[in-house]
Amino acid sequence: LISGPVGTGKSFIVTAFAGDIGIPIVKFRNFRSKWQGVSESNLEKILNILKAMAPVGVMIDEADAFLGDRNQEGDSGTSNRIFAQIASFMGNTEYRGKIIWFLITCRPDLLPIDLKRQGRAEEHLALFYPETMEEKEDLFYTLVQKLKLKIQKVNITDMFKKNHFDFSGADIESILIRAKFLATMNNHIFITKGDLEETIQDFVPPSYPHEIELQTLVAVLECTSREMVPKRFQNLDRDKLISAIGQLKALLGEQA
């Protein structure tokens, strides 16, 4: 189970991990049909293909919405049967280590406990926005390398501090792409300090502070590795964390 706020690179890290250990990765797409019985048949075919492909990684993005739960109504029980079919297959010890499931979600609290339990989702990992200046610099240069950009040597630390830099990985990637476009428009052969500063000052990321904070807190609560949790949360009392999550849900009009 990989959780964390939007823009933290959850899908990317799963794909990179699969490539690093040398197994193919497949992504679940919509296999549902309006005809009764066809959805279950399609899923059975998919599961048989996975058996034949093993070892293989299976990535389910937005897992909380994709998988549903046992209590869905209004489709003659199709969603219930599909959920039970997937849950049973994930828990089958015959395929443990051969078919590795990656459930990716911003809201692990919406996933049924049946899928999150040990034996189905063994590790609950969480990704967060960079918090220290060192983390921000590392992420910045990693994305420069990923995008294969030519960039003038600049003091990134000073630039970040000057512009109160507090963006997600997806925001940083968007800034770099925009800076590349600006450099091209200015006939620069590489991204200059001026291109970068102008782009950062102009960039206004979508801001959903309460939603992001909720996604962060539920990821902290779900994570099974203390080392992966930001230091400010490592010693936080779980009861206080649950209370804060409940308050945010109430603020957003969700059922706690």
Which sequence ranges carry the predicted segments?
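A short helix-loop-helix "switch/interaction" segment in the helical subdomain of ASCE P-loop NTPases
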Residues: 157-171
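Walker A/P-loop NTP-binding motif of AAA+ ATPase domains
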Residues: 1-161
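Short, amphipathic alpha-helical segments that act as regulatory/interfacial helices
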Residues: 176-184
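Hydrophobic face of alpha-helices
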Residues: 83, 173-176
